[in-house]
């Protein structure tokens, strides 16, 4: 059987989301998948006439040429979604038209869940694209259930947790000082501005910090996915989202009930236990595998830190 994976990565735009896609590509290559290199290098926010012409060239010339080199494919793995809906539509249509391969999606995000906490407002176009798959690798059972509830009937398997390419050795001599780290896009983590910890220090990494944080929080800047593991020396890592301390509320908080954040994989690959919202989809994995703790309320954050030294 000849298996291919599409590589739509741009090394010049590596960030946390690109890290997740790059890791999937690396592990697929290690498993013997061949590469279909798709050089779609256009900034997602570029609406210029030049960008439109470039997309047209990609759709009419580049994509068909790429698929000619994979006309013997039995399986083509596609990382969903791409940044450009226009190119994603053309790529999927051409794979279906020009090859006999089974098209398998590895889901990174589903915008119908991520951007709308009212699931009646899901995108018809997104569901149409998802229905084009021959198979889907979803994050977990809650995401699979959502897909099925919205009419997706193709075979679906659950990933559970993303693998994480982490060359950094695990620190075997870590001091216990009730320390916690949080990494991510800080503009969507406004709960941090409300946190009041007495005996625990929280270290932050990520872009777009707030103008001010409480004294219990120390902001250490933005690091690349390659540099960040070198700095993870804390006792616990936090997975939380939204505006509130007593729940993961709002669009991003709601999404935690369905997705498997790549940062969870970063933390565990660094040998650090995770503290996560009890209603998050990943909470069951964390507790069943004894790799952290699930809590209902961030006001309880200091309890596992104090009791599990």
Over which residues does each language-model region extend?
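N-terminal pre-catalytic "stem/leader" segment of glycosyltransferase-like enzymes
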Residues: 1-91, 96-104, 113, 277-282, ...
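Membrane-proximal helix-turn-helix segments that form the acceptor-binding/catalytic region
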Residues: 67, 94-98, 118-136
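Alpha-helix capping/helix-boundary segments
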Residues: 83, 142-144, 187-188, 274, ...
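A short, active-site helix/loop in glycosyltransferases that binds the activated sugar's phosphate group
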Residues: 115, 131-156
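Conserved catalytic-core segment of nucleotide-activated headgroup transferases in glycan assembly
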Residues: 164-233
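Nucleotide-sugar-dependent
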Residues: 229-270, 276-284
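A short acidic/histidine/glycine-rich donor-binding loop in glycosyltransferase catalytic cores
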Residues: 289-295
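Conserved donor-nucleotide binding/catalytic region of nucleotide-linked donor-dependent transferases
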Residues: 303-309
